[in-house]
Amino acid sequence: MKICIFFTLLGTVAAFPTEDNDDRIVGGYTCQEHSVPYQVSLNAGSHICGGSLITDQWVLSAAHCYHPQLQVRLGEHNIYEIEGAEQFIDAAKMILHPDYDKWTVDNDIMLIKLKSPATLNSKVSTIPLPQYCPTAGTECLVSGWGVLKFGFESPSVLQCLDAPVLSDSVCHKAYPRQITNNMFCLGFLEGGKDSCQYDSGGPVVCNGEVQGIVSWGDGCALEGKPGVYTKVCNYLNWIQQTVAAN
């Protein structure tokens, strides 16, 4: 799920996480099998969100993806078939950022502790946290099992999208008075390529580091409305302190 904000799906003030949100890859391509080994699927009876494996026992996702009963599925490519590389591990703890605001979608970040450590291998591995914040023009990889077109069913296999980080000025112009210092935009102003429903919580990886979390947007792949992502670099202390304390 990706957050829909009304007025105009992602309008002026209110943000509502719904199961018909806007977060799956539109205009991307099928990822090479197991080429995104840090990608996880959050399952609450079915796939609801993505996430990133950052240690063998911790997953990074979006706060709006919270569900009281989550199973983390690692090593997935086709989420509707058992292919042999999967590891299904229940969540032991889900820790939302204490300042998460569901109305503004600020601080849209959550840590999930697995009940048991994942077995790391070529098909299940971790992604490093960033050393620096992303800069405009940086090419990044977004991945997920979100819908290929807004309102349609999700794909069975993992989708990828290569997209650039946009400048703060472009981001603020696209979403006046909605972008906080904890958000950044990524994508194409001409539309046609974007994350969408059920990509939420998934990774944005730039230069081998997880720089973003799929968070919200106005529809999917609309002209002038790029995707908005949680800026992971702002949360390094919180992540490190939370992991150490739990």
Swiss-Prot record:
SUPFAM superfamilies: Trypsin-like serine proteases. Keywords: Calcium, Digestion, Disulfide bond, Hydrolase, Metal-binding, Protease, Secreted, Serine protease, Signal, Zymogen. Its EC number is 3.4.21.4. Disulfide bonds join 31-160, 49-65, 133-233, 140-206, 171-185, 196-220. The active site is at residues 64, 108, 200. Its cofactor is Ca(2+). Belongs to the peptidase S1 family. This is Trypsin V-B. It comes from Rattus norvegicus (Rat). The lineage of its organism: Eukaryota, Metazoa, Chordata, Craniata, Vertebrata.
